[in-house]
Design a protein with these regions (language model features):
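Helix N-cap / loop-to-helix initiation motif
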Residues: 8, 19, 35, 47-52, ...
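Short alpha-helical DNA-recognition segment
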Residues: 6-25
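A short, Lys/Arg-rich alpha-helix, primarily the initiator
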Residues: 1-8, 86-105
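Residues in the recognition helix of alpha-helical DNA-binding motifs
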Residues: 1, 15, 26, 56
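The alpha-helix within a helix-turn-helix
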Residues: 2, 13, 43
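Short, basic-rich loop-to-helix N-cap that marks the start of a DNA-contacting helix
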Residues: 30-44
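The DNA-recognition helices of helix-turn-helix-type DNA-binding domains
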Residues: 19, 30, 60-63
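Short, charged recognition helix plus adjacent turn
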Residues: 54-82, 103
Length: 105
């Protein structure tokens, strides 16, 4: 996907707010499954549309659910092409939810 978007690894992990070491772990350790929130960071960093996100999540063992508040909020951002992770985190916090962090993955 990075090649399709003419994006370097460094550009991607910075845009997605993913630590370089964590990104390397995702890339090189095939048995490692990143957290759901990290996958959402990846979706926002890749600027996926809603269908692409729905197709991408199962590749990493997740699915989009309208029963999960975080999914609804991230889905809103994706649907409306708002790829600002900081703004998404602010909205999540305002709703009493955890921001999309990945440092402890």
């Amino acid at each position: 996907m990075l090649n399709q978007r003419n994006m370097s690894n460094a550009d991607f992990y910075k845009k997605a707010h993913i630590d370089r070491r964590h990104f390397s772990k995702i890339l090189n350790n095939y048995s490692y499954i990143p957290s759901r929130n990290t996958v959402f960071l990846m979706c926002l960093g890749l600027e996926l549309n809603m269908q692409q996100m729905r197709d991408f999540l199962p590749l990493l063992g997740y699915s989009y659910s309208t029963d999960i508040e975080t999914d609804i909020i991230v889905g809103y951002f994706i649907e409306n092409k708002i790829y600002d992770i900081d703004l998404c985190n602010e909205v999540l916090i305002k709703f009493g939810l955890k921001p999309l962090e990945n440092l402890s993955d």
